[in-house]
A protein has these predicted regions:
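FIC/Doc superfamily catalytic core
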Residues: 1-168
Length: 168
């Protein structure tokens, strides 16, 4: 499903470059990206299609993290607010980093939040004229630590610095 989601991201990037505002693209396609990630599981009858429709309806916990994502009853409003933030923010790097961080902070789905957030970040970066960022396997712990600090200590600085090192 990762490849199908990647193809959707490429199509989204094309639409943004052709004039669709990036924040509107985020609002329009973030759920589709998530669905595409898990489409092979639906085809294999591992997941019911209904399980991928909309946001999560249950609590979710992140293994190894002290951050507890928002309660399921708050997800819809939080995502609506994130969509508005993405529409209003003009700076591509700010949109990319905040979009990624706030998305994983909310954790709107039961699974696939990190992968979806990285697709969001990259679509915002690429359409802003920056390179696609890949989190190297050997830096995954640093990435997770930076997200943990941002989520638990309300300090996004380390996460911003981490992403900046990947942009160089």
């Amino acid at each position: 499903g990762y490849y199908q989601s990647y193809l959707l991201v490429k199509e989204t990037i094309k639409q943004i470059l052709e004039g669709l505002p990036a924040g509107v693209a985020f609002d329009r396609y973030h759920q589709d990206r998530h669905f595409e990630l898990f489409e092979p599981c639906v085809q294999a009858n591992i997941i019911a299609p209904a399980d991928l429709m909309g946001y999560r309806n249950h609590p979710v916990y992140i293994r190894g993290s002290r951050h507890t994502p928002l309660p399921e009853r708050a997800v819809r409003d939080a995502m609506r607010t994130l969509c508005e933030l993405m529409k209003e923010e003009e700076n591509a790097i700010v949109r990319a980093i905040l979009g990624h961080f706030v998305f994983v902070y909310i954790h709107p789905y039961m699974d696939g939040n990190g992968r979806t957030a990285r697709f969001i970040m990259n679509s915002m970066l690429v359409t802003g004229g920056y390179d696609w960022v890949i989190i190297p396997t050997e830096r995954r712990e640093e990435y997770m630590r930076a997200l943990e600090i941002a989520s638990v200590e309300n300090d996004i600085t380390k996460f911003c610095e981490f992403i900046a090192t990947l942009l160089k």
